[in-house]
Design a protein with these regions (language model features):
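Sec/SRP-type N-terminal targeting helices
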Residues: 96, 112-113, 157-185, 235, ...
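Small/polar, glycine/serine/threonine/aspartate-rich low-complexity segments that form flexible
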Residues: 60-62, 66-75, 85, 124-152, ...
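Periplasmic alpha-helical coiled-coil/stalk elements that build and connect Gram-negative outer-membrane
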Residues: 163, 179-296, 408, 412, ...
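Acidic, low-complexity, intrinsically disordered peripheral segments
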Residues: 263, 273, 288, 460-497
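Bacterial N-terminal signal peptides that target proteins for export
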Residues: 1-12
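C-terminal motif of bacterial Sec signal peptides marking the signal peptidase cleavage site
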Residues: 19-21
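Amphipathic alpha-helical coiled-coil scaffold segments and their short linker/junction regions
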Residues: 60-61, 65, 73, 88-91, ...
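Bacterial Sec-pathway N-terminal export signals of envelope proteins
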Residues: 23-108, 285-315, 366-367, 392-395, ...
């Protein structure tokens, strides 16, 4: 076969190469931050209320202050720091998110290979026997060998940006996985801290319940002695026994909850239940952060991993629309080949070999596909609208989370103040009731009511103390957790690339 030089091919190639890289479809623009000046209707200028008890310190809101990367260190609890570090290093959810990010990045790099020509080499050798009868001739058959080698190059010109948009989509997916990793790390660290606080709260409730049981047991001994002396009726003894039994019945559920909480802490640290973590907690050993950094509303959309992930999804949908539009335009292909053929491998690269080469350019224009391409474009537009709405919903949820946390901090500070007053009042009332009962001034039923009130107030006080801590965790989590200030290597360099 004879190949003739086509003088127009180089000019055509130059023109197509010049056009390559022009991408159809909308270029992505990150949504601007919401035009709001605060998280709540009124400015946060006042500190929270304070109470003279564990977790009762006043907290101050510092607008515009950045959140530290290891925000849990603000609680000044070394055991808590160790547990969070263990969890971030060993939890399988983190490892899965890291692997998903690596996978997405490799797929994006693989997609980027379409920017370059494809070069392939081939080699074949065969030995054949033919008969003259196959050619309509008489005679004996002939045996011969054929060896060929070739090098082929093909290149799809990205004239309308289908490749560019596909790579853009893959890179946006990698960004999505990056922020999914950040969200996983934030959720994990928050869950560990909250689980530790729940551990401390349950231990406080158990301690209070045991103290109440001890006091009620002592009171039962007193009542029994009085019954022996004829000072009280048997009904009073039975009433005290019933009260003590009811209080004792509240202890096993608390101990069960503590055991389950220990299992949760162990699992979060990436361990099996039989490998229980050594760290234990009490509210008294954990400081309540008094200076609370509150980032500016304009920064929240950049700081929240879930908002950034939603933006990456929006970016991906935007790129997919570009791909769908580009698929409706012509596709241009350049290809070239060079090779040789000989009657044996030994002669393949010698003077006896026959040279082979080819050079071609092609264009494919979609004409009719049953409406597939048009519907794919419309589907991509709908997907972009969906992602935009989901992004807006994520932003609204982010601002609501911050507002909820701020409200909870203020309200629960007042609750603790009131609960402390209630506990102290109930304690004083119980002491007075015991003295009055001993003096015969009140009925035993009045004393029992005072005991029940004090028991409830002790447990409620511990719960109110724990709420101050969990509200603080909720604020740090709602503001994004300071991942941009992280210095640890939990996710190596994958967290910030």
């Amino acid at each position: 076969m004879t190949f003739h030089k086509i003088s127009g091919v180089p000019a055509t190639m130059a023109a197509l190469l010049f056009l390559a890289g022009c991408a159809v479809g909308p270029d992505f623009q990150a949504p601007p931050p919401p035009d709001v000046t605060g998280f709540t209707p009124e400015p946060l200028t006042k500190p929270t209320g304070a109470a003279d008890t564990v977790g009762g310190a006043a907290q101050y809101f510092n607008a515009g202050q950045d959140i530290p990367g290891q925000w849990w260190a603000l609680f000044h609890a070394p055991a808590l720091d160790r547990l969070v570090t263990q969890a971030l290093a060993a939890n399988p959810d983190i490892k899965a998110a890291q692997a998903a990010l690596r996978q997405a990045r490799e797929l994006a790099l693989a997609q980027g290979g379409a920017y370059y020509p494809s070069v392939d080499a081939s080699f074949s050798t065969s030995r054949q026997r033919t008969s003259g009868a196959q050619q309509g001739q008489s005679g004996t058959s002939s045996i011969y060998s054929v060896a060929t080698s070739s090098l082929s190059v093909s290149y799809d010109l990205d004239v309308f940006g289908a490749t560019q948009r596909s790579v853009e989509s893959a890179e946006a997916e990698a960004e999505y996985q990056r922020f999914q990793l950040e969200a996983t790390a934030l959720t994990l660290s928050s869950n560990v801290v909250n689980a530790a606080l729940q551990d401390a709260s349950l231990r406080g409730q158990i301690e209070a319940t045991r103290e109440i049981i001890e006091a009620q047991s002592e009171q039962l001994d007193v009542v029994r002695r009085q019954f022996t002396l004829g000072g009280v009726s048997q009904a009073d003894v039975l009433a005290q026994e019933s009260t003590l039994a009811q209080t004792r019945a509240t202890l096993p559920p608390l101990e069960k909850q503590l055991a389950l909480q220990r299992n949760l802490l162990t699992a979060l640290a990436g361990r099996f239940p039989s490998q229980e973590v050594a760290e234990t907690f009490s509210l008294a050993s954990i400081d309540l952060p008094q200076d609370l950094p509150v980032s500016l509303p304009s920064q929240l959309v950049r700081n929240r991993p879930d908002v950034q992930a939603a933006e990456a999804t929006l970016h991906q949908a935007n790129a997919q629309l570009g791909v769908a539009i580009a698929n409706q335009f012509p596709k241009f292909t350049l290809s070239a080949g060079w090779g040789s053929a000989a009657d044996g491998v030994d002669g393949l690269f010698g003077s006896a070999a026959s040279g082979l080469w080819s050079l071609s350019a092609g264009i494919t224009q979609p004409i009719f596909h049953g409406g597939t391409l048009e519907h794919q474009r419309r589907a991509a537009e709908a997907g972009l609208d969906k992602s935009a709405a989901q992004y807006q919903s994520t932003v609204l949820s982010a601002f609501r989370d911050v507002a909820d946390a701020l409200r909870a901090l203020q309200a629960d500070a007042e609750t603790l103040k009131a609960q402390l007053a209630a506990e102290r009042s109930a304690g004083a009332s119980l002491e007075l009731s015991r003295r009055q009962f001993a003096a015969g001034a009140i009925s035993y039923l009045t004393l029992l009511n005072a005991e029940r009130t004090y028991q409830q107030s002790r447990i409620s006080l511990v719960l109110a103390q724990a709420a101050r801590y969990t509200d603080t965790v909720a604020l740090f989590q709602a503001l994004g957790g300071g991942w941009w200030n992280r210095t640890d290597d939990t996710a190596n360099d994958t967290l910030r690339k």
